[in-house]
């Protein structure tokens, strides 16, 4: 059995390879998303700014979900060959759930901002405690929604079920979610020299998708051997999952990482 440290290193290595193989798709999608977000935040100051931001956020979710759906169906090594028709079909499949997720995110932001501002503006300790509780509630809700994109791409179910599964993954694996947030912040910091075009958000979501796949594999294995004692239960066959993931990637050298079309 592979130790957990080796599994983590394998996922990080595979993430780097996947980003290299999907370089052009990642750059194009990040450019479109960043242009929309930048316009809604910096240049558009009209009365419809909130509506525009919801639409831009929904577009971001839709692009990320469609990107993951195409990757799950075709494999990361074929993303460079994916035509516009395939991606458009995936967008039509996920746009409604993405819009609901964007609306939910904005409602949470507005509500959390108003409630926290109201409570922290009071000096009484009871209001301060309520403000801290509200801030933690908002943070937990946002943390649960971090899994929405990989959950939607994997299970392809309706919105409420996706939110429920996202919250379930978050509360069952809070430490993993925290580590993923730290890793994502590090990747975003590395994206600064590339103006967040690479790896950026679309590059980060690839690892979230693989981590969710790993967690589901572990959960299914433990559920299949739930009745056995810990001493008698066979170890989790991580090698089997790693072999399946290796088959999804074809570039394994540094040269192929930045020129996958030559592999």
Swiss-Prot record:
Its main location: membrane. The keyword Transmembrane helix applies. It comes from the Bacteria. The keyword Transmembrane applies. The chain crosses the membrane at residues 21-43, 48-70, 127-149, 186-208. It is a multi-pass membrane protein. Keywords: Cell membrane, Membrane, Transmembrane, Transmembrane helix. GO terms for cellular component: plasma membrane. It is found in: Cell membrane. This is Uncharacterized protein TP_0273.
